[in-house]
């Protein structure tokens, strides 16, 4: 098998040369080697990085039998558990995905809208101050409260303060670049497990699953054979949903607020569209506003949450464009590079929501939530939630940056986040 060309310098030397310039390194590789190139990470098998839309299409449309996708996510097993949807393949993955899809689509979204709006309003009432403040911690409070309300029905039921402290410590340890932080990981994970298993067992004993929170839905769900989910399966899916609804949602809201605070024209256009609505219009209509959707989409284009979708490990010999890949080859679809292709997105470094009003992009040109049977099950909910948060904030507050200097995304685990100390100034409209 002849792998695509790629950098041949020792990975350690690459790390020194491109230190702190992760995205620039990817762009350099694509310019030099094209939309499919091989990168050899130190101590691991080669990775084939894929950004060409035709290659992405061939990966996403290939039957799932060609890949072991869950196997590529094993690094998350210590955090997410053995039964997390992200780690499963084959029939087991298909079963879990089918069971977990309903809470995040259709009428279920509307049941969450009041919680999203109420929590956001409560928290931003503390933002109006002439002094700059660090926006990350303020947004984290909103997103954590929302995911707790959606998952458990009440923030108090799960001792939200204890969960907040435990979850924050656990995420920081798991994502930290410093190995000694992992010394605390096992103890923090055990504390979180105790909280979750206690809640699961208490709900089972009550036997009343009528409220629409996701824990109740998971407890009441049966598969095609009539089998209920086990406590372990529910725990692992709760952790997966918390991580998705907390860290990645926080990152997307932060980038959205950064761009609307940085570009006054974008902010004022959004506000004008919100003001044109009837104040009693339902949240579903607010989330469907064309320019609001365009701002959300452009935010995820310019800095995709992770930069990559989850890897696929080839299980059966497979041809992608002109390359034959043998079992064991790791294919890494790179959404960041695809979203920066100038022939698809002219002036790709500029934040231009209008591009999403002018044309519709294919799922192989724009895929911030992945694709195929690995498309994020929470995509519809994430878009609905984030757009409601933005609408609630901007209808009440005018935002500006404390420092107008351009910022660079920072790799944090698999996420590309704004600077931790990014400051915002919020004023009442």
Which residues does each predicted region cover?
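Cytochrome P450 heme-thiolate monooxygenase catalytic core
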Residues: 1-3, 68-77, 108-251
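N-terminal membrane-proximal hinge/A-helix region immediately C-terminal to the signal-anchor transmembrane segment
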Residues: 1-95, 110, 114-122, 347, ...
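Cytochrome P450 I-helix active-site segment
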Residues: 3-9, 113, 117, 165-169, ...
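Conserved cytochrome P450 K-helix E-x-x-R motif and the immediately C-terminal K′/meander segment
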Residues: 14-34, 194, 198, 281-321, ...
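Cytochrome P450 heme-thiolate "Cys pocket" and heme-binding signature region
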Residues: 26, 95, 239, 283-284, ...
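Cytochrome P450 proximal C-terminal region
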Residues: 30, 120, 163-166, 275-276, ...
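Cytochrome P450 catalytic-core helices
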Residues: 248-273, 380-397
């Amino acid at each position: 098998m002849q792998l695509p060309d790629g950098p041949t310098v020792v990975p350690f030397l690459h790390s020194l040369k491109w230190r702190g310039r992760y995205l620039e390194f990817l762009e350099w590789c694509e310019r030099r080697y094209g939309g499919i190139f091989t990168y050899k990470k130190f101590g691991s098998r080669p990775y084939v990085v894929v950004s060409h839309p035709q290659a992405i299409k061939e990966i996403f449309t290939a039957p799932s039998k060609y890949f072991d996708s869950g196997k590529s996510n094993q690094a998350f097993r210590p955090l997410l558990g053995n039964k997390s949807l992200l780690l499963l393949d084959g029939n087991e993955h298909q079963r879990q995905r089918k069971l977990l899809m309903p809470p995040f689509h259709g009428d279920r979204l509307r049941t969450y809208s009041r919680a999203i709006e109420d929590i956001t309003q409560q928290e931003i009432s503390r933002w109006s101050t002439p002094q700059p403040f660090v926006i990350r911690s303020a947004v984290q409070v909103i997103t954590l409260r929302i995911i707790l309300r959606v998952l458990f029905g009440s923030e108090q039921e799960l001792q939200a303060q204890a969960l907040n402290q435990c979850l924050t410590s656990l995420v920081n340890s798991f994502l930290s670049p410093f190995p000694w932080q992992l010394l605390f990981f096992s103890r923090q994970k055990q504390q979180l497990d105790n909280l979750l298993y206690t809640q699961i067992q208490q709900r089972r004993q009550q036997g009343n699953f009528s409220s629409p929170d996701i824990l109740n839905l998971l407890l009441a769900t049966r598969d095609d054979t009539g089998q209920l989910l086990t406590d372990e399966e529910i725990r692992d899916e709760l952790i997966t949903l918390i991580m998705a609804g907390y860290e990645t949602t926080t990152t997307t809201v932060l980038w959205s607020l950064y761009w609307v605070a940085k570009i006054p024209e974008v902010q004022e256009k959004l506000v004008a569209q919100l003001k044109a609505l009837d104040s009693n219009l339902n949240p579903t209509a607010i989330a469907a506003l064309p320019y609001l959707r365009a701002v959300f989409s452009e935010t995820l284009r310019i800095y995709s949450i992770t930069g990559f979708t989850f890897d696929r490990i080839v299980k059966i010999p497979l041809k992608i464009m002109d390359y034959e890949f043998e079992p064991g080859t790791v294919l890494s679809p790179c959404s960041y590079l695809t979203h920066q292709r100038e022939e698809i997105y002219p002036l790709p470094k500029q934040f231009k929501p209008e591009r999403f009003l002018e044309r519709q992009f294919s799922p192989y040109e724009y895929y911030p939530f992945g694709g195929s049977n690995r498309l994020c099950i929470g995509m519809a909910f994430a878009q609905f939630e984030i757009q409601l948060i933005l609408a609630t904030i901007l209808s009440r507050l005018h935002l500006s940056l404390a420092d107008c200097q351009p910022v660079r995304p920072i790799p944090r685990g698999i996420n590309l986040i704004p600077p931790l100390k990014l400051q915002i100034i919020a004023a009442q409209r």
